[in-house]
Amino acid sequence: MAPLPTRPSARSRRLKFALAAVVLAIVGSSVTLLAVDVYLHRKFERSAGFNIWGYRGPAVGRKTADEYRVVMLGGSAAYGYGTNWDEAIPAVLERNLTGRAVGPFHRFTVVNLGYNNEGAYSFTFTLNDYLSLRYDLAVLYEGYNDLMGDPKAPNLSVFRHDSPVFRLTGYLPIFPIVFKEKAAAILTGTTASQYLSPSKTVFQRPIATKAAAEVLLVAARAGESLERQLGRITAEPARHIDDPDSAGCRYPWQQYCRSMIVAVDFALQHGAQVLVVTQPYGAGPTFKSRHSDQQSEMAKMLERRFSGNPRLRYVNFGDVVDLFDPQLSFDRMHLTTAGNQRVAAAFAQPVLEMAAQRASERQ
């Protein structure tokens, strides 16, 4: 007869119960938060948010044989800050190309991979993250977010990689952002208040209102706490820009140019074409002068490094939009719906020409 199993001690039972409770709490919280997050994605992905895979607009399906797929990378200008997803440049460009055909391509898809504050450093990460989209053309559309040109503090923002969940699964949670902004709006009447310094004075709301906001903040912090726990598993190396001087650009644009080189090289090595585009020149003499200088250095670098490569093209939209025109720009940087339409119209011909070049490769 086999010996009877030893009955666990009271202390052992308590420890196992505590462990089970912790596991169930984490799993239960995760399932609940996931359900909430999916709902919020559906609610906000067509306005100011992004879909479950971390890019703006509806998720695209499997690429078809007759499809020419474009991805547009950049900061808030590409993302379409201040407008709905279908008013941003990528969505307008896609509509403008509807019905056009170039060789074997009878369908054009433009995917918005931009995000607020992203600079050139983020491009290689984003191109790698979305290789599964099998894009034909990568549009690199950003200079504003690298205009500080500070070698000691370059723009190393890679928004999606701030999420351990995205790094591990490709799913990008949205509820911490939504809940924090809703709480800020409840307390101060504007989502921008969450970004103010602690010393900034804001009007106080009644106790009940503050309690409602606190519930939202607690929920957001719970999600962030779960992400931090997951972050221990998916930790990444510290972000930095390797060998910026090798770009050959004048100070202070070496890091910007180096990031552009790395991104272009990555796209070309993975079989994609690249369209590098200068944004409308900044408003005001200082902004415009600095932006023009940055883009001039970058354009000369592309010519030195990639001259003669038919899969790379540079175009300059510096004068396409006057950022002083309130009909085209609401803050002298970000574009209105009309401004986005004008830039999207300028994009159409270069994209069609790149598609024609791609078609010639297939012959």
Which residues make up each language-model segment?
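N-terminal secretory targeting modules
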Residues: 1-71, 82-84, 102, 121, ...
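Serine-esterase "nucleophile elbow" of acetyl-processing enzymes
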Residues: 53-115, 124-134, 138-139, 340-341
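Soluble non-cytosolic domains of exported or imported proteins
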Residues: 80-88, 117, 121, 247-258, ...
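Solvent-exposed, polar/charged alpha-helical surfaces in well-ordered, non-transmembrane soluble domains
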Residues: 91, 95, 121, 125-128, ...
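Sec-exported extracytoplasmic/periplasmic mature domains
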Residues: 94, 98-102, 128-132, 143, ...
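Residue-level recognition of beta-strand->loop/alpha-helix junctions
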Residues: 112-114, 278-279, 316-318
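Serine-dependent acyl-ester chemistry module
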Residues: 145-303, 322-326
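Catalytic His-Asp segment of secreted/periplasmic serine-dependent ester chemistry enzymes
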Residues: 239-247, 282-363
